[in-house]
Amino acid sequence: LDKIVKELEYKGRAIYLPPKYMKDFKSGIVYIPKEEETEIPSVEEVSNEKTFSKNPQGILLTPPGLSLTNLFEKELGTDFLRTDLPHLQENMPKILIENLEIAQDLQMEMQGNIVNVKITDSIYKNFCQEKEKLHNICGSIGCPLCSAIACALTRATGKPITIEKDDISEDNKTITIRYRILEE
């Protein structure tokens, strides 16, 4: 994926699109624009189910964390489309810590259109450390866990989401991710 984005010279930050852009609400799409500053493609442009969008130029991919998001919903016995951010904030720790044992701790804080997530002792920590070498993935599309949370956020809010920043602590124990909820 990193090589594809690099070879096609796509420079924009990945945008996770909400379910209204898809025919199947359980699917997901992440849009990577050709240029750094760009607008979000129309619902019509995305629903054509093509890999490349023409207006604006970009690539439409299945998010790496989509299956994990669907597993989160299954574990909770809910559909994130029928929830909201406070519900997600309350239940994501239960899923990741108790149900799936993916992390030792998860904190989710909302500040306006910013969602900050802090994950401690994740089973993905080594993966995150390695993926930092993949500049087109780290901090844009994200690892499967960061991507899964972005998919859950876009379902719960009904709005596009970007991963603004992700960091892993020096001791490799804590992953901090900042998501932005976009207006269309």
Question: Would you name each region that the model predicts?
Answer:
Residues 36, 111-115, 173:
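Beta-strand-connecting loop/turn residues
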Residues 116-117, 160-184:
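Short terminal or interdomain "cap/linker" segment that borders an active site or interface and mediates
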Residues 81-86, 140-144:
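Short, surface-exposed ligand-recognition loops at beta-strand->loop->(often short) alpha-helix junctions
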Residues 52-66, 89-131:
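An N-terminal amphipathic alpha-helical segment
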Residues 72-77:
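Acidic/polar low-complexity scaffolding segments in large eukaryotic proteins
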Residues 1-71:
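N-terminal topogenic membrane-targeting module
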Residues 120-168:
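Short, hydrophobic/π-rich interface segment
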